Amino acid sequence: MAEKVSFEEGKLQVPDKPVIPYIEGDGVGQDIWKNAQIVFDKAIAKVYGGHKQVIWREVLAGKKAYNETGNWLPNETLEIIKTHLLAIKGPLETPVGGGIRSLNVALRQELDLFACVRPVRYFKGVPSPLKHPEKTAITIFRENTEDIYAGIEWNAGTAEVQKVINFLQDDMQVKKIRFPKSSSIGIKPISIEGSQRLIRAAIEYALANNLTKVTLVHKGNIQKFTEGGFRKWGYELAKREYAAELASGQLVVDDIIADNFLQQILLKPERFDVVALTNLNGDYASDALAAQVGGIGISPGANINYQTGHAIFEATHGTAPDIAGQDLANPSSVLLSGCMLFDYIGWSKVSDLIMKAVEKAIANGQVTIDFAKELGVEALTTRQFSEVLLTYL
């Protein structure tokens, strides 16, 4: 019988036939999702022989939702994901004009999905600008709900920004606004709770996956109390809650300035296992690391609240409207995000099967047009690529 996934006493309770919502996505979402779903279902059937099955339930967001309901992110969609805990999604178009700045950010903030998790690894055969891309194997934990992504800012020349500037200058005695008459102002909230729950999740992930080092990435040399606070609170958490693991050497927690980190992931990526970052730094680092191993077209991602069990797994690339509906898009990002979903619900054999199929296809030069051009091989369509994966399952 189809049932919802539940979360009890800090653990997911997964029935044999869980109902999992999906958002097809805009642009190439129509191409990648339908092909990925076929691969998911075949892998589940191969592993469990019909004893387990995902019941996929479509929910609306993005352009499809707007066309059908007049709302880019319907309340019904949020409620369904809240009650079902999990979802997987394709890329979403950002609405033009006022209102929601980003549907992806809105989903993360509405559901308090505080950890953006991106495992970055190299697949043999993927074109990369690096001589040794195989040395890059880093899992990113990016804080998802704070920092400048809170969207607290005021436009230059408005009465609102003038109130803020007057308060800063008159009440707080701030002297460092260089051009107060023409400045926009933004606020960067970073909290103890927000920082520590993210860093705790990163440490727990490292310990669960036999990884030793968790590195705190920050700009505390410039922003002493926000970025510096992230670093400080991370060390305090580690010493308070993981003293035994630190003492035994099972866990090492260190830190690095963000700009140096962006150098070191090119020069010595092997020195990092798991990295925890504030929101903006995490945004930069996620895409920079993805470029080292083939780009965001093959990068999976998940947005997770480890305290409630809620999680959305997603294709990390954009909508690519120039190739939408043409059966050209690489479905690997949503496929590998599906692998993260299956790992999350404890169906790791399904994840392993799909991962090995993707590895084999790429190693054999059976790739979509994004990689085929650089490898000098004939490009497969989205459908052909998924059919190749089916033969490898």
Curated annotation (Swiss-Prot):
Catalytic activity as recorded in UniProt: D-threo-isocitrate + NADP(+) = 2-oxoglutarate + CO2 + NADPH
Cofactor: Mg(2+); Mn(2+)
E.C. code: 1.1.1.42
Binding site for Mg(2+): 283
Gene name linked to the record: icd
EC class: oxidoreductase
Record-marked site positions (Critical for catalysis): 149, 219
Subunit structure: Homodimer.
Highest taxon, organism lineage: Bacteria
Cofactor info, note text: Binds 1 Mg(2+) or Mn(2+) ion per subunit.
Function in brief: Catalyzes the oxidative decarboxylation of isocitrate to 2-oxoglutarate and carbon dioxide with the concomitant reduction of NADP(+).
Cited SUPFAM superfamilies: Isocitrate/Isopropylmalate dehydrogenase-like
Keywords attached to this entry: Glyoxylate bypass, Magnesium, Manganese, Metal-binding, NADP, Oxidoreductase, Tricarboxylic acid cycle
Stored Pfam families: Iso_dh
This protein's record includes keyword NADP: yes
Record-given protein name: Isocitrate dehydrogenase [NADP]
